[in-house]
Amino acid sequence: LLGTQTPTHGNIVVNNNDITALPAYKRSKWISMVFQNPAHGTAPELSILENFRLASLRARKKKLSIGINNDFRKTVEEKVASLGMGLEKKLEQPMGSLSGGQRQALTLLMGVMDKTDILLMDEPTAALDPKSSQVVMQLADKINKELGITIVLVTHSMKDALHYGNRLLMFHGGAILRDLNKTDKSALQLSNLQEWFS
């Protein structure tokens, strides 16, 4: 989906567009990414506000010299306040001084700042403590339900996959073992998973 690897065969179609034939800047209009490590995808030496501006400029292919106006600051304050972490009062604080959970939650917000269609999340809770993991997953669920953004989540947490996913693809050794929709998942028992991998 990101276009970093060429498919061995077939095409990847998003919004009736073959994205394998599109340049990266056009794919970036539809797809945003949240990395496993909260430090990736952000500039730790820049403030929270500057990181939001950088993410917005990248999404719009604008020059990085454009300043931060009051409207942009207000928009960021409102979005960050919705997290309930009090970070809207610390927008000048360097991103690198925040906890992993705080950075990952902010990275999620940055990924949807300019209304993407698809948000790719590569094990976004792998480096987080259980409480921060729950905050990040609940935020992702809210983004999906309230903004209608499709989330492709890569996770080793069957609990998260079963709880938050509408469709579940189970991989092993590079092959799809199971393709389940929400109805199929309701009958799925975690105790049955081991036999699928044997």
Task: Show which residues each predicted segment covers.
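Q-loop/switch helix immediately C-terminal to the Walker
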Residues: L46-R58
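Helix-to-loop junction immediately C-terminal to a conserved catalytic motif
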Residues: L2
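ABC ATPase NBD coupling module
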Residues: D18-S32, K62-S65, N69, K185-S191
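H-loop/switch region of ABC-family ATPase nucleotide-binding domains
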Residues: T155-H156
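Catalytic Walker B motif of ABC-type/P-loop ATPase nucleotide-binding domains
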Residues: L119-D122
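ABC ATPase C-loop
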Residues: G111-V112
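Conserved ABC transporter NBD signature motif
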Residues: G10-D18
